[in-house]
Amino acid sequence: MLQTTVISSILVFSLVILLLVVLLGIAEKKLLPQGDVEILINDDKEKSPNVKPGSSLLSALASQSIFIPSACGGGGTCSQCKCQVLEGGGEILPTEVSHFSRSEIQDNYRLACQVKVKNDMSVKIPDEIFSIQKWDCTVRSNHNVATFIKELVLELPKGEILDFKSGGYIQIDVPKYEFKYSEFDIEKEYHEDWDNYKMWDLLAKNDNPEEYRAYSMANHPAEGNIVMLNVRIAHPPPQQWDAPPGIASSYIFNLKPGDKVTISGPYGEFFIKDTEREMVYIG
């Protein structure tokens, strides 16, 4: 009797899941247009791609090599993916309101990561966005410079230059992965601290193939053929050691010389102003 009840419960549960999947498929076909939609950019047809509906505006443009800054990886928290959605974006979402002033909302400013592409759209983005590029770089070195900090040096493809200003940053793509911290190459002088904190026991995992994070360059702009990043490992806090460690920092700590890494950039707007006024630098 008990066995029959268990089997019946499993069958009912499976049928409910199957029904929901079918309903979602039908709803998607009904609510989303079939075929591509156009994103008109800055009223310029030549810059305006046709994309598949269903993704965020941020992801849709990135698929066409138009990279709007998003330091939080599309989480809706950094507000750096601001743009004007003039048509086709619908009403502003509650998750966006706190990032804009009343006048900005009236001027149709939105967060590209929160706007879903459902139909033809008209948007306005800064022209400098089109100078942002994407490269497949090679890891030159990845050494510890402190107990929990690594200095990652990436080489751009031959002949390519990252033309950035001090204060700029890049975004690094994080692929799907799963590995243990015991696989990291950590200099022996830091092993004792890693032993004490039981860092080797941690497990890192990323299931999202479209994950990315922003990191500021640590090298001089004149060294445009490399990208140097100083990255601190984001391990769980001591009182919540069962929490997952940082997705991007764990990925970076596991990189070895010769590995391929995809980056985009340069991004940034926090630069030294050309002024005669006195400036105070805090490090």
Q: Which residue stretches match the model-derived regions?
A:
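Transmembrane-cytosolic junction motif
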Residues: V21-N42
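Membrane-cytosol interface motif
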Residues: D36-S55
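Residue-level marker of beta-strand positions
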Residues: S56, Q80, Y169, P257-K260
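Iron-sulfur (Fe-S) cluster-binding segments and ferredoxin-like electron-carrier domains
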Residues: L58-P69, S79-F130
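Ferredoxin-reductase
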Residues: T138-P257
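FNR/FR-type flavoprotein reductase catalytic core
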Residues: A243-G283
